[in-house]
Amino acid sequence: MNLHEYQAKALLQRYGVNVPRSQVAETAQAAVEAARALEGDAWVVKAQVHAGGRGKAGGVKLVRTLDEVQDIAVSLLGKRLVTYQNAPDGQPVEKVLVEATLPIARELYVSMLVDRSLERVVLVASAAGGMEIEEIAKDSPEKILQEVCDPLNGLVDYQARNIAFALGLVGDQVAAFTRLAKGLYRLFKENDLALLEINPLIVTAEGALVALDCKMSVDDNALYRRRELAEQRDWSQDDAKEAEAHNAGLNYIALNGNIGCMVNGAGLAMATMDLIKLHGGAPANFLDVGGGATATTVARAFKIILADPNVKAILVNIFGGIMRCDIIAEGIITAVKEVGIEIPVVVRLEGTNVELGRKMLSESGLSIISAAGLTDAAQQAVAAVKV
C-alpha cells in the first residue's frame, strides 16, 4: 500500500526527520490560503498521486506569486496526471501539497528497503540525489552505498557514520545524518514498510538535512496490525479492478495482455502466465482466487476480469485441493449466465471433484472449451485470441 507524499512526510516528522513547511489543499482557493499562511516569496505546488516522475509530467511546479499558485492548482486538481510510472490514463489528482521553498546546497539519495536475497533491511544512499536511482545503479553502480542492518542490532551508529562520510558530510552533519538514518530504520521496522525512499534528501545552505520528497510503501500483509496506516489508503489511486478484487478477498494485478487468467494459488498463477507467454500469448492479469473461494467469489472474479476491455479470452486453471472443482464449475456457470460472456473461456480442472466439475460444465449448455492439461489450455487460449 502506497502513501501520498504528505502522509509520508507526516510520518517522517514523528521520527525526527526534518521536512519542509507545507499544507495540503483540495481546492485552488485552499492552495492560495496555504501559500499565504506559509509566507515567503516562492512555493512548490505538488500533485499528490502514487507515481514517480511527477516533475517531468508537470505535476510539480515552482511558483512565485499567489496567482500562479491558483493557476497551477486549477490545472492539476480534478485532472488525471500521466507519468511514465502509472497507467496510460494516469491517476486522479484530488489534493496538492503546497510547500515552502528552501535554499539547496546539495541533493542526496537515501532509502530503506528489504533485500530479499540477503533477507535483511538495507540502508541505501548515494551522493547523486534528485535523479532516478535505477539509472544511477545501472550507469554508475559505484555511486550506490549500502549498509546491511542486522535484525537483532538494527542499524548501528558506525554504519550510519560510514554512509555519512562516504556522502561527503562533515561536522555536525555526520551526527545529524546518523540520527536521521536510525530514525528511518525505526520508522521502517515499526510501521512494517516495504519501501522508504527520500529523493532528494537535501543539505540546505545552512547545512541542515531536510527530506524534500518521500515515497513510502507499507507491506500489505501487515495492514491488519497497522490500522492507522490502512485507514489512509487512497483507493482512487489504485486500479479500479484491483480495488474491487481486494474488497472481494481476491489477489488481482492488472497486466497489459489480452488473455484473462483465473487460477487458484500464486505459484500456479505465475506458471500459467509463463505458459501463455511461452506459446505466444500475453496475460491480461494475475488473479488468485485462493483456496476458500465460493461460487459467488468466482463469479465476481469473472466480472473483474471482464471489466478489462482488452481481454479477448479467459483461461481458468484450477487444481482442486482445498478449492473443489465443482465449486469452480458452479461459479463459471453463474458468471457466464449473469455477465453474458461473449469471449472464449478455456477451462482446465484437476483435483478434488474434478469429474463432477467437468460434468457440470459439459451439461451446462454453455460454450466452454475444456482443456486436457495445462499446456493444452494455454495453447487453446492463445489460439482463441488469434481467431
Curated annotation (Swiss-Prot):
It comes from the Bacteria. Mg(2+) binds at N199, D213. The keyword Metal-binding applies. GO terms for molecular function: ATP binding; magnesium ion binding; succinate-CoA ligase (ADP-forming) activity; succinate-CoA ligase (GDP-forming) activity. It catalyses: succinate + ATP + CoA = succinyl-CoA + ADP + phosphate; GTP + succinate + CoA = succinyl-CoA + GDP + phosphate. Gene3D superfamilies: ATP-grasp fold, A domain, ATP-grasp fold, B domain, Succinyl-CoA synthetase domains. Substrate binds at N264, G321, I322, M323. One of its GO terms (biological process) is succinyl-CoA metabolic process. Its cofactor is Mg(2+). The keyword Iron-sulfur does not apply. ATP binds at K46, G53, R54, G55, E99, L102, E107. It is an enzyme of class 6 (ligase). Pathway: Carbohydrate metabolism; tricarboxylic acid cycle; succinate from succinyl-CoA (ligase route): step 1/1. Transmembrane segments: none annotated. Binds 1 Mg(2+) ion per subunit. Its EC number is 6.2.1.5. Pfam families: ATP-grasp_2 (PF08442), Ligase_CoA (PF00549). Keywords: ATP-binding, Ligase, Magnesium, Metal-binding, Nucleotide-binding, Tricarboxylic acid cycle. GO terms for cellular component: cytosol; succinate-CoA ligase complex. Residues 9-244 form the ATP-grasp domain. Heterotetramer of two alpha and two beta subunits. Belongs to the succinate/malate CoA ligase beta subunit family. Succinyl-CoA synthetase functions in the citric acid cycle (TCA), coupling the hydrolysis of succinyl-CoA to the synthesis of either ATP or GTP and thus represents the only step of substrate-level phosphorylation in the TCA. The beta subunit provides nucleotide specificity of the enzyme and binds the substrate succinate, while the binding sites for coenzyme A and phosphate are found in the alpha subunit. This is Succinate--CoA ligase [ADP-forming] subunit beta. The gene is sucC.
